[in-house]
């Protein structure tokens, strides 16, 4: 299995705005151009035909529409600016905000910043900066159903926990309950994650494009489907890590530089949560210099002072007690 995993890793390759004009350019030139058409008739009454000039009523209607639109945009700019939200930055990232009625925007702001939801303005600004769709999503047919789903179906315990979940993953507010959130919830429950309220950040992830491919990756390393799934059940945060930027380099270091069995990550999938450069490599090199090999949890989970103390105790001439966690430590010959 180790050779199969190494072969797979060595052959794998790393995988890897809307620009909207400023307000000063928001003008509409809908006036038809004057036309000049020579009269080819032989009639002597007129050599030239009079230019086609738009009627006064058409010009007035166009002007009124333009002025109304600009007035609406200006009102939204002033309103959002009063909340500390940069309107021009938002429309550059999310142009539909331009055509959203001010009353609809105000309704969303009121709902999210007053009881029972009761986000502070600072928190609300952060939500909007990360999820501008919040301001343009229909309140009654989208935003409220998302909130209701999180509280009733996912089992988020309280409004406080709801705010925490949305602070951590504002994109939840842009997701469809029927097409995104509920299918992902069912998938997580099906693989044995029975406390989804603790992992709401995963609900915005695509099952087909993100969750399943990560389980498949460990199957290709030689793990059974059951073992790979159990690893994600034990440590659901593993779904959030990149295959190319996290799994692959850390597994290569584990097997090639550390000389460990790939199956160690089955029991300690938290291995992938530690920085390769700042934690894994320095700890391994310190152990190698002393000629010892710790279990991965002992090597990585303790703070720096605790790790150094453990290393010194292990290298002492007196053996550890049988009840000590160091009894599993292997000393390299």
Swiss-Prot record:
Residues 1-55 form a transit peptide. GO terms for biological process: DNA-templated transcription termination; embryonic morphogenesis; plastid gene expression; regulation of DNA-templated transcription. The keyword Plastid applies. Transcription termination factor required for chloroplast gene expression and protein synthesis in chloroplasts. Necessary for chloroplast photosynthetic complexes assembly by modulating the accumulation of photosynthetic proteins. Essential for embryogenesis. Expressed in green aerial tissues such as cotyledons, leaves, flowers and siliques, but not in roots. The keyword Transcription applies. Disruption phenotype: Embryo lethal arrested at the globular stage. Seedling-lethal with albino phenotype due to defects in chloroplast development, photosystem assembly, and associated with an accumulation of photosynthetic proteins. Its main location: plastid. The lineage of its organism: Eukaryota, Viridiplantae, Streptophyta, Embryophyta, Tracheophyta. Keywords: Chloroplast, Plastid, Transcription, Transcription regulation, Transcription termination, Transit peptide. This is Protein SEEDLING LETHAL 1, chloroplastic. Belongs to the mTERF family. It is found in: Plastid, Chloroplast stroma; Plastid, Chloroplast stroma, Chloroplast nucleoid. GO terms for cellular component: chloroplast; chloroplast nucleoid; chloroplast stroma. It comes from Arabidopsis thaliana (Mouse-ear cress). Signal peptide: none annotated. Self-interacts. Associates with the plastid-encoded RNA polymerase (PEP) complex. Interacts directly with PTAC7/PAP12, PTAC12/HMR/PAP5 and PTAC14/PAP7. GO terms for molecular function: double-stranded DNA binding; plastid PEP RNA polymerase core enzyme binding. Residues 38-67 are annotated as: Disordered. It holds the Pfam family mTERF. Gene3D superfamilies: Transcription termination factor 3, mitochondrial.
């Amino acid at each position: 299995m180790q050779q199969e995993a190494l072969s797979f890793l060595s052959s794998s390759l790393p995988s890897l705005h809307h620009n909207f004009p400023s307000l000063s350019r928001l003008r509409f030139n809908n006036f038809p151009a004057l036309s000049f058409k020579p009269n080819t008739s032989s009639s002597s009454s007129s050599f030239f035909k009079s230019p086609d000039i738009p009627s006064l009523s058409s010009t007035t209607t166009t002007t009124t529409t333009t002025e109304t639109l600009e007035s609406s945009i200006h009102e939204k700019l002033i309103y959002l600016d009063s909340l500390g939200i940069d309107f021009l930055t938002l429309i550059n990232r999310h142009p539909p905000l331009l055509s959203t009625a001010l009353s609809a925007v105000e309704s969303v702001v009121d709902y999210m910043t007053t009881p029972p939801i009761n986000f502070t303005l600072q928190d609300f600004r952060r939500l909007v900066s990360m999820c501008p769709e919040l301001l343009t999503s229909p309140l009654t047919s989208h935003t409220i159903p998302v909130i209701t789903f999180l509280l009733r179906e996912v089992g988020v315990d309280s409004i406080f926990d709801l705010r925490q979940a949305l602070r951590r993953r504002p994109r939840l507010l842009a997701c469809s309950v029927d097409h995104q959130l509920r299918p992902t919830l069912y998938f997580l429950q099906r693989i044995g994650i029975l406390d989804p309220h603790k992992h709401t950040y995963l609900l915005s992830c695509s099952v087909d494009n993100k969750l399943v491919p990560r389980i498949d990756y460990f199957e290709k390393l030689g793990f059974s489907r059951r073992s790979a799934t159990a690893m994600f059940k034990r440590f659901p945060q593993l779904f959030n890590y990149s295959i190319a930027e996290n799994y692959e380099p850390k597994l290569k270091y584990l097997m090639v530089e550390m000389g460990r069995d790939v199956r160690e990550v089955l029991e300690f999938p938290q291995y992938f949560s530690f920085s390769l450069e700042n934690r894994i490599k320095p700890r391994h090199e310190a152990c190698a210099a002393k000629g010892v090999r710790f279990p991965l949890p002992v090597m990585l989970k303790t703070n720096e002072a605790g790790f150094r103390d453990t290393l010194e105790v292990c290298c002492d001439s007196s053996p550890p007690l049988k009840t000590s966690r160091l009894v599993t430590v292997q000393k390299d010959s």
